[in-house]
């Protein structure tokens, strides 16, 4: 395994030894990263992902994937890639578990709505909210002075969770669209990034990112097929495929030719051809599961092999080495991701559903602002009262909304509408 250092396992806030161990208890022999993973696994923030949208909402269909089930799948894939590359598997696993922990209700639609209402405090970004939850909002470690350190994860764990390891605003004043830290959290990010000589994410974060792409593309396509939104026969319809490739390249980058090549290589796989005949029978469900299993193994195995070949003789870990994704795997994953996203987006009810979701977020924001601090939960109420500016107060309100489940947000939106109607 890669030789992780004491600095990698260092935590921002020193912790006292546990005092409640039974005298007969065995000494805790877990590594720092195993403890980190346990903290994420037992966090309320992770549990709340069970009631947050993945591609379709948690209440659409009998067994749709949620942000939580998606995160568990990402963690399992990341753990496998990490083990294959001799990285710490717990470190890769926890990066997968918490990669979406900052996502608000309604996924990217909710993220865009919150970014609008958060303009006065610098905007909203799901990846930056992940860091904020891990280092501030999730209650675990609090200093004697009352400062929250969130889960107080190790440096390497936080680094593995940072997909875009830079703050919103650059030194020259330019602004990044994607980032892993709000400007007010830049000091925390600087502590995390000690030892890095460039802006590349550590290889554990690269593993998490590609594992997310694998899970998103393969498993969410499975959900789309079962829900009737996706038909794999499009891979053989060259006219529709060309239009889809154009949309996918515009949405995710690359060229249409790359996506068409991905479709061509997928057509050659017997498991894909078998799954394309999905008819809701027992045999077709089994064929679909066979396809998802084989595709995940295909992308994991080829990426491990390519990375090992490129870095032969080198200890890969942290800021040493990059994940090498074969071109065929990359093009297939991008094509499947296009299928998963665009067919849902083209659903006639999708735009109307998104508008309703945005309206709920705006309504709850207004309700909390007008009633603050009394309208806030006790923990957020305390932060609101202690805030030094209106901008900081808005950030606290946005933090609370982002942490809500969709069910709770919808209940609060109904209450806000009832109060608004009563007041005229």
From Swiss-Prot:
Belongs to the dGTPase family. Type 2 subfamily. Residues 67-217 form the HD domain. The lineage of its organism: Bacteria, Bacillati, Actinomycetota, Actinomycetes, Mycobacteriales. The gene is dgt. HAMAP family: dGTPase_type2 (MF_01212). One of its GO terms (biological process) is dGTP catabolic process. Disulfide bonds: none annotated. Residues 8-18 have a biased composition (Basic and acidic residues). Keywords: Hydrolase. InterPro entries: dGTPase, dGTPase-like, dNTPase_2, HD/PDEase_dom, HD_domain, PHydrolase_assoc_dom. The keyword Nucleus does not apply. This is Deoxyguanosinetriphosphate triphosphohydrolase-like protein. Residues 1-27 are annotated as: Disordered.
